[in-house]
Regions:
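Terminus-proximal functional modules
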Residues: 1-75
Length: 75
């Protein structure tokens, strides 16, 4: 399980709160077993689509809490 601080940072970034500023064309996430990215276009459109960096599988979430409950946080 990820720290409460990292989960809050992830939630705040996805909900447009806090001081998060994307520095690239993608936002990077991690889980216990995978790494994924969200395109900047999806982030700006509030679409929670993560693409697994090793398999190419796309994970879609409806809320930040759903994404967090699946074990994903900012990398």
């Amino acid at each position: 399980m990820w720290s409460n601080e990292l989960q809050k940072k992830t939630r705040d970034a996805l909900e447009g709160k806090g001081e998060f500023v994307p520095l690239a064309d993608a936002i990077y996430f991690k889980s216990d077993s995978s790494f994924a990215e969200m395109s900047l276009a999806d982030y700006l459109a509030n679409k929670l689509h993560l693409t697994d960096r090793s398999t190419g599988e796309i994970y879609t979430f409806h809320t930040a809490d759903e994404l967090l409950n699946a074990g994903w946080v900012l990398d």
